[in-house]
Curated annotation (Swiss-Prot):
Pathway(s) served: Pyrimidine metabolism; UMP biosynthesis via de novo pathway; UMP from orotate: step 2/2
Keywords noted in UniProt: Decarboxylase, Lyase, Pyrimidine biosynthesis
Identification of the protein by name: Orotidine 5'-phosphate decarboxylase
Family: Belongs to the OMP decarboxylase family. Type 1 subfamily.
GO cellular component: a single term: cytosol
Reactions that this protein is recorded to catalyse: orotidine 5'-phosphate + H(+) = UMP + CO2
PROSITE patterns: OMPDECASE (PS00156)
Source organism phylogeny: Bacteria, Bacillati, Cyanobacteriota, Cyanophyceae, Synechococcales
Length: 243
């Protein structure tokens, strides 16, 4: 049956394979009609290892490897080089690792991809996790800035380091897009279709609103993966972006 949504809409949605065993993740990704992108996070990667990235790519999928590297520059660069060599097309690092580490990571993803004939991935700098609330950020980490100001500072740091984009909550997308035009990518989790539970995310938005605000791609997990009809839930999200 022909899809009711455009390929462009499908490219904008990354389905997070969180909470799945390796076999479940592979079976799930194979069954969702029209799926283009999947996210492999820490839990799945630790269970399955690098092979899961290769297996998902063999299904014709594009992989967002969301391991959020945060270490000294040499270590971050080595990890990013190997992630790029696997064929992951989006890779995350923490912006607060600093400019030297970000520059080293960016150079490494280019080297890793080119040395193995893979597409050069987009390196994404994580700003402030969507589970953080402003009062906790100030109390627990002694960050005096508000979340919006902190996100803006970290995104600027990433852009100056030559990183290809950042990860932020949908609530910061509009202000960041005003500061950083395309092709600087803004990838946002914290996406919840109308009428679904927000779960452990506290800074959330619907898919159409996030795209309208300037997001490049959206990360959606449980509203699709825990649906009784994952293909239908994915199609509904895509259709919402097509209208």
């Amino acid at each position: 049956m022909a899809s009711s949504f455009s390929a462009e809409s499908a490219e904008r949605i990354i389905v997070a394979l969180d909470g799945m065993a390796p076999d479940q993740a592979l079976a799930f990704s194979a069954q969702v009609q029209g799926l283009r992108w999947v996210k492999v996070g820490l839990e799945l990667f630790v269970q399955a290892g690098p092979e899961v990235v290769i297996q998902l790519r063999n299904q014709g999928l594009r992989v967002f490897l969301d391991l959020k590297f945060h270490d000294i520059p040499t270590t971050m660069a080595g990890a990013c080089l190997r992630a790029a060599a696997l064929g992951a097309e989006l890779i995350t690092v923490h912006a607060c690792a600093g400019s030297e580490a970000l520059q080293a990571a960016q150079a490494a993803v280019v080297e890793g991809a080119q040395s193995t004939g893979q597409p050069v991935p987009t390196l994404l700098a994580v700003t402030v996790l969507t589970s953080w609330e402003e009062h906790r950020l100030q109390r627990e980490l002694a960050v005096e800035q508000g979340i919006a100001e902190r996100v803006s500072q970290l995104a600027l740091l990433a852009a100056k380091a030559g990183v290809g984009g950042c990860v932020c909550s949908p609530l910061e997308v509009a202000s960041l897009r005003a500061q950083h035009r395309e092709p600087f990518a803004l990838v946002t989790p914290g996406i919840r279709p109308q009428g679904t539970s927000v779960g452990d995310q506290v800074r959330v938005m619907t898919p159409p609103a996030a795209i309208e605000a300037g997001a490049s791609q959206l990360v959606i997990g449980r509203p699709i993966t825990q649906s009784e009809n994952p293909s239908g839930a994915f199609a509904q999200c895509c259709t919402a972006l097509s209208t």
